Design a protein with these regions (language model features):
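Arg/Lys-rich RNA-binding interfaces used to dock onto structured RNA substrates
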Residues: 1-60
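Short beta->alpha connector loops at strand-helix junctions that form conserved
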Residues: 15-17, 55, 81-82, 104, ...
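A short acidic, often aromatic-flanked loop/helix-cap motif at beta-alpha or helix-coil junctions
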Residues: 18-24, 111-115, 132-133, 174-175
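Short basic, glycine-rich beta-strand/loop surfaces that mediate nucleic-acid
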Residues: 32-34, 96, 143-148
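Structured adenosyl-cofactor binding patch, chiefly the S-adenosyl-L-methionine
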Residues: 35, 69-73, 84-100, 157-196
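RNA substrate-binding interface of SAM-dependent RNA methyltransferases
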Residues: 36, 40-132
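Active-site/ligand-binding-proximal alpha/beta "capping" segment
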Residues: 125-175
């Protein structure tokens, strides 16, 4: 019953069939209303010194975990580019554990990302398993942005070519690569340890 859910002035109310409500809500049994809101425009902080960039990270749990870790370790912003998981999917929101509402997060195209970093005077380093990559402990990551790639493919060749340098997390010989959230956490810890 629509009268059971009073709305603020100016809010429109519609009745949807059960199939549409099931599509719009991840809950098995909806408590009633489903709503949409306009998200506020994200403004990045000034100064911008420590940025984590995720490119094509498709697992929403990893995206949420990176946002939560970035908030815990004092990163200025997280930027999502490429085909990253939906920032507001239920799994991303759960994994972020509330940090999504405290941590500046921006979603943008790669060219916009590069313009933003250039305008703020930040170098961009790409985490990569290449011969050109330097031990992250030997690279000054403050101020800087560090890009972490997708779980299966890493950073795209296009973004890697735009990086000012490449870094690698030193690991034991024969160890498998880390997943995106763990790699980002190690990088953020190093930034927090050395540059804040």
């Amino acid at each position: 019953d629509a009268a059971a859910f009073p709305l603020p002035d100016g809010a429109a109310q519609y009745t949807a069939d059960a199939e549409l409500v099931a599509y719009a809500s991840p809950l098995m049994h909806s408590p009633g209303p489903v709503f949409t809101v306009r998200l506020p425009e994200m403004r990045l902080p000034q100064p911008l010194r420590h940025v984590i960039v995720l490119e094509g990270v498709q697992d929403p749990g990893n995206v949420g975990t990176v946002i939560r870790t970035a908030n815990a370790l004092g990163m200025d912003a997280v930027v999502l580019t490429g085909a990253c998981a939906d920032l507001y999917s239920p799994k991303t929101v759960r994994a972020a554990m509330g940090a999504l509402f405290r941590q500046p997060v921006l979603t943008c195209a790669t060219d916009e990302l590069l313009q933003l970093l250039h305008a703020r005077g930040l170098k961009l380093y790409g985490a990569a398993l290449t011969d050109a990559a330097q031990d992250l402990r030997r690279v000054p990551l403050s101020p800087a942005a560090v890009a972490i790639g997708s779980e299966g493919r890493g950073l795209s060749a296009q973004l890697l070519a735009q990086c000012d340098g490449q870094i690698i997390i030193p690991m034991q010989p024969g160890a498998e690569s880390l997943n995106a959230a763990v790699a980002a956490a190690v990088v953020m810890w190093e930034i927090a340890r050395t540059g804040m």
